[in-house]
Regions:
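OB-fold and OB-like single-stranded nucleic-acid-recognition modules
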Residues: 19-136
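Bacterial N-terminal signal peptides that target proteins for export
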Residues: 1-10
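Bacterial N-terminal signal peptides
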Residues: 10-19
Length: 136
């Protein structure tokens, strides 16, 4: 009976160790929840969302976004992602996370994620993304 108890304890210990190993996060990453995924939207819906972001900026502050587009550098030095469909075009300014952030090549198709913010330029408030990252 003592041998069976020892075997049972050993098996239980092994099972507990095996179960705990499965709880370890190998890559130490966390999945970021995206509040507004414009990649998943149809072009007309994406255009409408761009319009709404600039008209109702306060509703989108501190929300996370995933936005597709073409990287452009504006004449004032601001970095933008430019979206265009068959009839219309819009752009959103973004600032990459980190002081040594490396921006993509001009006119490269990208997908960026970032947090919605607001800035004032020439007395007008504009929506932009801060802490942005290029994900594709």
């Amino acid at each position: 009976m003592k041998v069976i108890n020892k075997i049972l304890i050993a098996v239980l210990a092994f099972c507990m160790i095996f179960a705990l190993v499965g709880c370890v996060d190998d890559d130490n990453t966390t999945d970021t929840v995206i509040d507004f995924d414009l990649v998943a939207m149809e072009p007309n819906s994406t255009y409408a969302m761009f319009q709404n972001l600039n008209k109702n900026t306060n509703e989108y502050l501190n929300k996370s976004f995933k936005i597709p587009g073409t990287y452009c550098l504006m004449s004032d030095g601001s970095h933008t992602v430019f979206f265009s469909d068959s009839c219309c075009s819009e752009y959103i300014e973004f600032k990459l996370k980190g002081v040594d952030a490396e921006y993509p090549e001009l006119y490269e198709n990208v997908v960026i994620t970032g947090i919605g913010g607001q800035k004032t330029v020439d007395g007008q408030q504009h929506f932009y993304l801060y802490d942005a990252e290029i994900v594709e």
